[in-house]
């Protein structure tokens, strides 16, 4: 399988305005895969003898987990991207290199995204969670629900209100780069070069043993563990380079609307089309002022150019997000659940179903399609304006916010229904 999925971005002051960190990700996955947006509350786990069931394996539970909102392929336990109640955001990428990908079932990179969010209340603590679990349980297993074998190593972009970390892996070996200002992006290639702020203790020795590094020249993680020529990486016409250019084009004035437009960019390939396409997108505003709420926008539908970014804010007593939650199936409580179905179940959630009907109209590019897209943009613009007001006025109406994402999906579905039935 060729590296052909996902782009994750972060922008920090002074590249942004109003002392905000902006996080964004497109999740590029098989075109027939449904991605859901789900919420899990914080929890206390008294019985630590009871193991936690991830996608393929069981691991030790911890005494406490944080509330999380996740955008995830509906068939698995983990997540492609998400955030927790402490303002930590994580997105992961598939990466390939010289180290062989393990076919044995272990933790998926997507499991590690969720585990980092549930167990880390800062970006660096989430990184610690991921690398500790990587050492203990390893990474591996098929990342596709179908018969296609799709396995890879992972890179992660982890951000909070103060900083971001890039974590890139090759099997159990890893390197991490701290990002405290400016812009950074990751795509489907190793990108940490000589600026290595943390690393696996045996990473360099292993590279020497394999003959990938002579131990004399300056150590470059990407050059050592990757197939790619890192000297060409920043000038090649790939998505990593194009994403870097788009971030730098707006450097100094980046807002969450800027990040939305980057995720919608089709000429660069960041908004992907084809057998692999952008199945869901996320943008988060992480104010450095801890008195302000973090705001997370999700599409829950494919193609961000023809989707609505809808806000979510962590407040007490949030109920499950029914319009973006996929159906569950009887056999899905056991580890290795995907192997128990002879064919793929219908995992389309209510928003996804209506959006698919809307796409049929939008594909025709008629006057009706233009009207519907205009209404979608109008709704989104109103939501953006409302969220900006929350940040500027420093006031939250908790009784309204508790059902914010649900109400937004209701409004979006109403647009689709009115145009599909007319």
Curated annotation (Swiss-Prot):
One of its GO terms (molecular function) is cysteine-type exopeptidase activity. It holds the Pfam family Peptidase_C69. One of its GO terms (biological process) is detection of temperature stimulus involved in sensory perception of pain. Residues 1-5 form a propeptide. The keyword Plastid does not apply. The active site is at residue 6. The modification Pyruvic acid (Cys) is found at residue 6. The modification Glyoxylic acid (Cys) is found at residue 6. Keywords: Pyruvate. Plays a role in thermal nociception. Belongs to the peptidase C69 family. Secernin subfamily. This is Secernin-3. It comes from Bos taurus.
